[in-house]
Amino acid sequence: MANRSLKKVIETSSNNGHDLLTWITTNLEKLICLKEVNDNEIQEVKEIHTQLDEFVRYISVLENTDDLELHSVFISLSQLYTISIWRLKDEYPGVVFDSAAFLTNVLCEEDVSIDDGDTDPNQKKKKKKSSTKKKKYIYSPAKDIACTILVQLFENFGSSISSLIPLLFNAIFKNLKKIMEKSKYYHATFMTTLLQLFNAILRNSNNDDKILDPATYAKFSKLSKTVFDSISTDEKDFSVTFVSVLIECWTAHFKQTNFIREHSHDIIETIYSRFTEGEIGVYGFANDETRIFTAKSLAEILFDYYFSKNILTLQEVWSIYVKIFLNCDTRDVESGCFESIIHLINLNLLADNTFLSNSKYLDIVLSLSGVFSSYEVNNRSMNTLSRYLRYFQHMHEVILPHLNDSAKTQMLYYILGCSDTYQSSSKSDSASNFKYSIDAKPETQWLTLLQLDFTYVLISDLGSTFTTEENTVKEIRDKLVDLATCEIFTIRVHTVEILKVFLNNCPEYLSETIENSLRALSTDFKSTGKFIFHKNHGHAFIIANLIKGAESDYISYELIMRITVFSTSFIKNNTTSTSSNLYFKGLLCWILLIGLMNYKDEQYLKLQIPQLFLFWKVLLTHTYTYHDEDELYKNLEIRNHALTCLLTYLSNTTIDKEMAKQVSYLLTKCSNFNHSIDLKSKNIDNALLHNENRILQVYLKLEKYINSDFNSSLLILIVKNFSDPNLYTESSSSVLGSLKDIGNRKVSNKDDMESNIVLESSINTLLRQNNGFAFGLSSKITGDRIVNLSMSSAYKYDESISGSWPSKDYNWYNIFEVEVSKPISPILSLDSLILLYGSGSYSQIDRYAPQVTTSLIDSSMELFSSVFPFLNSKIQYSIMETLNLSMFSKMTTPLRSVAVAANVCSALHNALRIMQENNLELDYSVGQLIIESIKKIQFFNDIFLTKIKADCVGLLTAAIARTLGDEERQKFLTEQSRIFIKNVADMDEPYLRMFHVLSLATIFKYNSQYANFEEYFDVIFALMRDPHPVVHSWSLKAMHILLEKHLVIDLKTAALLLSSMEELLVQDKYGIYGRSTLRCNYNRDFNSHVAIGEISRTLTETVGPNFLELNTKVLDSFRNITLSMLISNNILNSITSIKMFENIATFKMKNILNYEIFILASKSIIKSSIVTGIGSSYFDTTFTGSNELISRTSSLKGAFENFDLLTLLYKLQMEEFFMKEMENLSWRYLALFPNSGSVKNYFTEWILHTFKRDNHWFDKLYSIFNMSLGRLFQSYNRDVSALLEVNGLKKSSEKEIKGEEEESIANVNQLTDTDAGGLDSENLQWKSRQIILNLILMLCLESEKYENLLLALSNKIADLIKISFRGSTVRNEGMKLTGLHILNFVLKNYSTMRDPQVPGSSILEQQEAQITSALMPAFSKGSSPTVMSFAITVAAEVLASNIMPPDKLGRISQLLIDLLGNFKDPNSGIRIGEAIIVTPKAKRKIELAVLDAWAEVVQRSITSSNDALFSFTRKYWSILVPLWIISLREYMMIKYNDNDSTVQVKNDSKENSLIEPRSTKIELYEPVWLNFVEALGCTLDSDVQVILASLNDEELEYFLFILFSQCLEAIVKNIDDHSVKMQVLPALHNVLKSNLCIKSIFEDDIITEVVEIMDRLISTGDSKEEFLLVDIISDLIIGYSKCNATPETFLQDIDKLYELLRLLMTIISERLPFIKYNVLTSEEDDNEIKISPTDISLLKKTFIAFESNISNFDNMFKVDLYSCLLFIIGKIYECSHREVIIPIILPLFKALVKALTESEDEKNIVLLEIFYGSIKDVIYHKLDSKNKVATILILLSNGYSKLSFQELNQCANILSEALNNPATQPIALQGFKRIISNIFKYPLLQYFMKLVIKRFFQDIQTNDSLSQASIKTKLIIQFSEEVIKQDHQKASLSIALCLSFFAAYHSAYTEKIDNEVASGIVALAKLDKNSFKEAISSTISPQQKAIIGSVMEAYVKSQSLGSVEEAFQLKSFD
């Protein structure tokens, strides 16, 4: 279709929308993917462009264009048109202007139907006729296209086409005027596009200061006035987008020089008034859509005034914002102000990258703090002022990523008034710094809270990296403690929260701070003077908060017990005291107890709880007699604190039924007392409300145990709490009074700005209330979801309500938009104890609790939802009737009715979801009552209520249906669905239809297994085509709900849906575009295009790989939908489109979508979100570019989701599409957003998928780690600089940064810091560097698996150590640990590598100093015990790795020696370097780390045979061994002491002699005990006396048995954990391999259990484990033999030995199943057995174990064992794998043959004879030569004598031939030597040698090879020597034999061997001269004698020895 004429396509089309969009999509894909444009491609682009022009001409003259009203298609067409111009403009420079001029003519309704060169007379005739046609200035598709494209052309080429502006202005205003004249001309989209064109011209012309001439301004001003007047009088509605663009257009006017000149004297006041009072002021911020455009416009105007024109200072700019903010009446303006502020900050940051440097952001914050003016503080509620603080918090969240660490640190120091290097000593600076400093004055407390909030953010972000100086840390700590104990309560509680974060970053000061506060409390409690409550409250609150979450490494158990004793002893004596000082002290003690309930130790809680329950019973169950209001109030406050303590306890313990019963009793009594109180006052009411709320919160903890038996009176109370229509009807009311039926009381509220306004009755109206209570609406309701409270322990259903639209949080400004609809502020000071009892937040969205009335409503609803599902049906029915009375009461206000309806529906909805999750049933009558109640609720146009009602209908039908059988269930569902289908058909009201269609969808959703999909589908499908926007959008949403639960969809339905989705997407009668204002506005919030995208996405998931089976037209429709949504400039659509692509990519369907396009779009979203701002382009700029500084509204959420997509593409191995282009961008994201899990995952996958083929990964990471931010952002800043220049914003003083095309910033040859001079030299923030460090560690650990990568990394050892040093020097635990892990990696992997320049030395020897330097910072002040423990481990690795002798590693070895000294005084602290350890737990952690380190060094010194290291460690064995033994004993005592849950600490001083929970100690021993066992095993094996010095024999045996048991227990507990088993099994081997007898192991029960464990390990483990098991089983066999040394004892428990041998046999049989006695296998079966090299090694080891053990067994036992083993060997000889396996069993075979032949028992010989008989056929005919020779040699050389003469002859031939074969010659030669040595031991061998020698003679005569003959000669000589040595009588014969062979030898090889023969003869003569003479003279033949003589004569001559006689004389031994 791409090559077809577009005009012809449309002329012949039956579906214009589909065919036009398909043509556009096809060509868009083509143009976007063009890389280098050659001539042919240029012509193709030109052709596309021409066809587009032709198409526009064609439709401009069409009469009927109704089916071409396709604005969404025209957006895609505009993209194609603009891209084609970009591709052509270099080749055809005039194409930009010509195209714009042509489109201008179309818009101006000029005749464009015929080109000048067209000669067609018919066309000329048409032209003539049309030239007289009157211009209508109304909408037409051609003009819509022209206008749309012109907007984009001006955004891209504005300066090139500015001459067309007058024509366009004229056309724009004439068209707008005409359109607005009559409703029939009205076209919402076209008039918006016209105004967008006007604004695009204003923004992008090259003469912006004069562009808005007076005449044009007058037209525009008039238009604006007309529009706003019409809105004001409700005369006419306009598209909100149109109004937004109208407001944008005003920006150009305010930026013009004339305007500025005219208002130069009052420019600030003018801007202020225009944005608060005039047209913009009234309408700009009020609407959710226009607000963001108004915010952008204000920011751009002020940016122009400040940055471009310098007419305002920055301080004046902020003052304008403050003034607007303070003088507004609604939250809309407040949010808009901060949205504008952030946009302005980022515009300035782009223009000046130093805009936020140093403390400039703090200046901004303090300038904006003017919103806390004295008037505001005095006249606004706490609710409002708290919201002001949240605006600042949101601003910090957005801006903080762009601040570097030094700027953050500087601002923190300024706020806290630190006397650091940042502070100057000059007077001017001191005065300046004073303005930053924080104080605690009542009149400035809100400013102080603002500073505290910022401090919290900074400290949380900086972690511990800023705490480098001890003085500074103490200064900050003291300042925070001062603030935390000041007079102002709000400041106190906020400061404590900061102090907690600060001290968790500097935990070494935790204990000291708590001690100081406890000391202060103790002093004041004892003092008789005035008790200063605020100061002591601060100290108590500090202690309580610091205990929560603190590590026991820093807070000792002893300190916890002191605090416990302090608080409980006071309460015990003053439980209910209300006298002044005792009351206050009691409250503080309860606060301490609340904090103590958070101490992380279950055993501690168990110890304290009896006493606490006593307190609670005394306080809560007894009726208190009071005399006045003050006494009652104080008692209620004490009760409240006691209840909070109970709540905190329940949050930290395991609740059981008995405990729930106890607590429930307490609560009932407490509640009864509250209801008995008649005294009425504001204070008492408030205290009672807090009490009731706390009671409900405690009930929430018990809900699991009380839900089926809930207190009915309490149930009535909680229902009234959230549904009583008589509550909250006015500004405020006394809830407690109403609960007691005592009437309502009103309280005025200055923030209630809307009390006199007639408001729409909807949730939206409630959410926009300013009165702080929103008519009793729950804070759980947010408008689009129902949130759960964090304190509820019940089921959490965090799924959005059915029918919810995608979240708006893709837009960065959504955090401010949420504030617009958040009427109730969470405030810490209203319930400061939440810091202690809370789990980190009040709810899923709020950190703190709201006011107590709202919190009571929330708790009541949460408790109701948890209890209602489990009540019986009668109670449920009764409750629903009560709720109906409340919901439909006429005696209340409309807004209160809405609030009640929302609360009830939300509570019911959560209850029904719990029923759904737990598969609970609901009685039919109850269910029907609820359904009818829901239907009766009015407020039909309220979206939230409609959605939740519809979802409840679905949940209700499911709950009722569960009571029915399958058949009845289907019938019931059919009935219900038909009711709603009938309602849809009968009712025309759109909102009612919306409710019914959503109800239909939810019925299917929750009953999909039983409902008929087609029935629901058909109805909803028909409704989708309803043109009413409400019905259309919600029907689509209902279809989406339907499809999400229909998991299998047929292709026909999928095709129908996709075709329909395309149709609904492109046609202007549906969706966001078109004539109707109502439809356009409604679709701003409920965009049907978004729903279409969701449906399409769901189809990609459901249809999956079957997508490929759809026909071409449907696939075209799908492609059209995805690409249209991708380029729609709507982030939701773009993300949905990209997720559709993600699904397609996951299924690897590459032919459906163009991957490159979607990845470009993904990258564009990521890039546009680096800087936060509001987009200024009306079109997606991914493929066209833009001249705007911020063209697209940034979306960090969208960016992170696109990182997730790219991560997935790595997993799918599609990185070639994006990896190179994303490299620089991803590094920048890592620099800015290190907290993002998506970014971290991206880098992890990137490395994991590329590190094998990219050897430069370490270089990249190392480079980025050391890179400055300036260098990192250099090319990005260069691009921004170019944009600034285009927009005329680049100041003359700026110098352009020169650079080449952007290349990888991680290039090894990157710029140095000096190269990047003038740029920001600040390093990446510490979090980014921590991630890089972690990535380096990951790279190292992954490289360990690949030898080549490990070798490649060896070239980077110096850099690895350097990066380790960089990490270990940062004051952050994570970075220190990672640095040490990298160092450990280097030591473990490279210590054995030799230095190529000094081969004898380790490659690490030269790095010794650097290694030490990287290690020692771990012992600097502030290092955690965890860091120091691991550093000690690394120090041990340095020593053990043998990079240098210990004496040359002075600092390291001395460190370990010094650490041993700490064991001398158990009561003192430990000092390591600058670090001091004081708490017992931390101290023990270090001590165990020291012992663990020494254990490692000792083991390695023994196993590595390192003499120097052994000598070094040996000196300390006498110290270490007792310490290891003691530690292991301690471990076992802690672990197995069942008498109590606590252990007495043996060596503590009396002062510290307090019981310490077992759990706090046992965790210390778990990681190290195994290493102690291994070390003791090694030392035991090396020198048993060292251990015997500490333990006697009996103790040692018992101790070793305990160690053995521990190892077995660890194995059993971790039977499925390979890593644990690989640690434990070597330790077990070390324990067993000692030479000691451990008798206990072989007791019946124990050995049985041991065998069972071994069996399981063999059956489930891998080969590595089995290798170790062979050693262990062998150890046990040896141990059995030692423990049963006598024959009697040996045989007594022989079955145990059998079991151990069976285990070995099991290992063999698993690999050789054919050896099993009862298994019959054929050779074919054998072939199926796969034996790996690992199996071969394991078999070899197992057979060796057999061989090494059998000799030690009793003879009686051996027979059975021999039989078994011979059977196995025989099976092996017969199997098909014999050639591989036989070499393994030969040593065992040899041992067996030797043992059997040497046995005196004839049975053994027979046994061997039978064996030989069974395998001799295999030996002689089937074995290969090597195994054959080896087998024969084993039989012969070990004395097997049952061979026949024929077999002996055959053996002689085989072995003789083996000598001739190079492959078998070594084996044969060695075998012959052994045979010769045994010829007199085994007589048969003499005969055998006779045969062999005979064969030798034959071989010589047949010209054997010289080398073989030489070997045989030597064997004959050896034979003769052995004969002479053993039997002298045969000496002459044996010498004669040799001489005969020499003669034959000489005859065969003549002169070649004369010297060799002569040497042999001389050697024979030496053996026995007389026998030699006798042989010469009388035995050998004359011929042989002659030969010998001639050889010797020749030898004598050659050696010049004289005569032969002389030669023999010389050589003789005489």
Curated annotation (Swiss-Prot):
Biological process annotations from GO: clathrin-coated vesicle cargo loading, AP-1-mediated; endocytosis; protein localization; protein transport; retrograde transport, endosome to Golgi
InterPro entries per the UniProt record, alphabetical: ARM-type_fold, Laa1/Sip1/HEATR5, Laa1/Sip1/HEATR5-like_HEAT
Keyword flag Ligase: no
GO annotations of cellular component type: clathrin-coated vesicle; cytosol; endocytic vesicle; Golgi apparatus
N-terminal signal peptide: none
Pfam family, one: Laa1_Sip1_HTR5
Chief localisation class: Golgi
Matches recorded under PANTHER family: HEAT REPEAT-CONTAINING PROTEIN 5B (PTHR21663:SF0), HYPOTHETICAL HEAT DOMAIN-CONTAINING (PTHR21663)
Quaternary structure, from the entry: Interacts with the clathrin-associated adapter complex AP-1. Interacts directly with LAA2.
The protein's name in its UniProt record: AP-1 accessory protein LAA1
Gene behind this protein: LAA1
